[in-house]
Amino acid sequence: MMSYLKQPPYAVNGLSLTTSGMDLLHPSVGYPATPRKQRRERTTFTRAQLDVLEALFAKTRYPDIFMREEVALKINLPESRVQVWFKNRRAKCRQQQQQQQNGGQNKVRPSKKKPSPAREVSSESGTSGQFSPPCSTSVPVISSSTAPVSIWSPASISPLSDPLSTSSSCMQRSYPMTYTQASGYSQGYAGSTSYFGGMDCGSYLTPMHHQLSGAGATLSPMGTNAVTSHLNQSPAALSSQAYGASSLGFNSTADCLDYKDQTASWKLNFNADCLDYKDQTSSWKFQVL
């Protein structure tokens, strides 16, 4: 029973953690007690001491050592306390001056801010006065912009209302530049334009220029029964016109057009090999190969 009581309470790996054991493990390490930092006592000045110090501070903010010692003897305080008081008093004085300057600036700033809205209002009124004439002049601008609409509106309506007249006028304007017998040619195609009411005939009639190679691609999708039915009636107007090889300005170098005037017969051979155009005894015939 006594041996149980004498057994050390903490045993780690067979080593008893006692004070003697710690001393054996760390003989060179000392554990000195941490010295408590002595706090300097706060000096409390009486009213009489403050009056003496304030009187000296009013004379000079930076007293020399002799003046500080003299005041320290008067108020029964060490000279270091007097020196610290002057240091703190100068800092307080600077802080007060800074606050006064900031307060003065804060007072001046609202006075600056108050007229600034008035200036802004005056500037806004000035700008509104400057911009008000453009607002008044903008009405004639709108009227002038509406005027071209009223002028151009008949022109925009007329092509929609009468597409045949515009297409025929385009033909009459375009073909006299290339063909010598333009009047008869335009009259001959005037009848065909009535059958192409909703289409742009200029794109399909321009193959009569020297560029007929691209016309085969444009005319090839037109090999339909509806187009043939319309074209079967149009050669009467074309056959009534007399065309000579010398009257039409076709170049003999055009590989895509073979024009022959044999018993008033027309023959157009395209490279696309999709259209065989023959006019024999006033008959039109389209053969889609």
UniProtKB/Swiss-Prot annotation:
A molecular function GO annotation: DNA binding
Bias-annotated ranges (Low complexity): 95-106
Record-linked CDD domains: homeodomain (cd00086)
DNA-binding region extent: 38-97
Family annotation (InterPro entries): HD, Homeobox_CS, Homeodomain-like_sf, Otx2_TF, Otx_TF, Otx_TF_C
The keyword Cell membrane belongs to this UniProt entry's keyword annotation: no
Cross-referenced Pfam families: Homeodomain, TF_Otx
Annotated positions for site Determines DNA-binding specificity: 87
Compositionally biased intervals (Polar residues): 123-137
Keywords tagged on the record: Developmental protein, DNA-binding, Homeobox, Nucleus
GO cellular component terms listed in the entry, alphabetical order: nucleus
Similarity field: Belongs to the paired homeobox family. Bicoid subfamily.
Known role: May play a central role in the initial events of axis formation and in particular in specifying anterior head regions and their spatial relationship with trunk structures. Activates the head organizer gene cer1 by acting synergistically with siamois and mix-A/mix.1 through the 5'-TAATCT-3' element of the cer1 promoter. Also binds as a complex with lhx1/lim1 and ldb1 to the gsc promoter to stimulate expression.
Protein name (record): Homeobox protein OTX2
Originating species: Xenopus tropicalis (Western clawed frog)
Taxonomic lineage: Eukaryota, Metazoa, Chordata, Craniata, Vertebrata
